Regions:
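Gly/Ser/Thr-rich loops at beta-strand to alpha-helix junctions
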Residues: 2-9, 61-66, 116-127
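Hydrophobic beta-strand segments of well-ordered beta-sheets in folded domains
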Residues: 1, 20-21, 54-58, 74-75, ...
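Redox- and metal-dependent alpha/beta enzyme cores, enriched for Fe-S-associated oxidoreductases
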Residues: 38-103
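Short, basic/hydrophobic alpha-helical segments
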Residues: 1, 98-113
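Short, well-structured alpha-helical interface segments that form or flank functional binding sites
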Residues: 6, 95-99, 112, 124
Length: 158
């Protein structure tokens, strides 16, 4: 592992979205995007109710299926087929950013101001999530880390 997921999100939050950056995953073979034209695009799924309480848990299942926390208000952003190597091309990362941003905007429109993130995400998605979380939009942002058999609080981004 390159670094714990919560620390990658913290790194992303420090870089922010104003600085241009390209984040690659750490593939087994090389530090380059996959050039194969038949590389399948990931398909992301999320559903956000029209109204939510101020504080919610957001499960993010991309590299694996993340266990849901013991919380009454849980929403999920996930990929159809979780896989550690799911983001293979820059286009895939752009699709992820676009879809995850739509997820965040729906949370805000639904009334969420305090968010607890429960991620199972690859390197690039972890850093990008940190870059995309708008500190002026959310009052508090908490990231949890899976330490079997449960989630443990790891870092507060805001």
């Amino acid at each position: 592992a390159f670094a714990p997921i919560p620390m990658l999100m913290k790194l992303g939050s420090l870089i922010g979205d104003k600085t241009e950056a390209t984040v690659l995953d750490l593939p087994a073979e090389r530090w380059l995007w996959d050039k194969h034209v038949d590389c399948q695009e990931p398909s992301f799924i999320f559903s956000v109710p029209h109204s939510l309480p101020r504080e919610v848990a957001a499960v993010i299942s991309i590299s694996n299926r993340a266990d849901h926390p013991d919380s009454p208000n849980v929403v999920e952003f996930r990929v159809v087929e979780p896989n550690r190597d799911i983001i293979r091309q820059e286009k895939h990362l752009n699709i992820f950013r676009q879809q995850f941003n739509a997820f965040l905007m729906q949370l805000v429109r639904s009334g969420v101001r305090i968010i607890h993130l429960y991620p199972a995400t690859p390197i690039s998605a972890s850093v990008e999530i940190g870059r995309m979380l708008l500190p002026k939009t959310f009052e508090e942002i908490h990231v949890w880390e899976w330490q079997a058999p449960t989630w443990k609080p790891a870092v507060r981004l805001k």
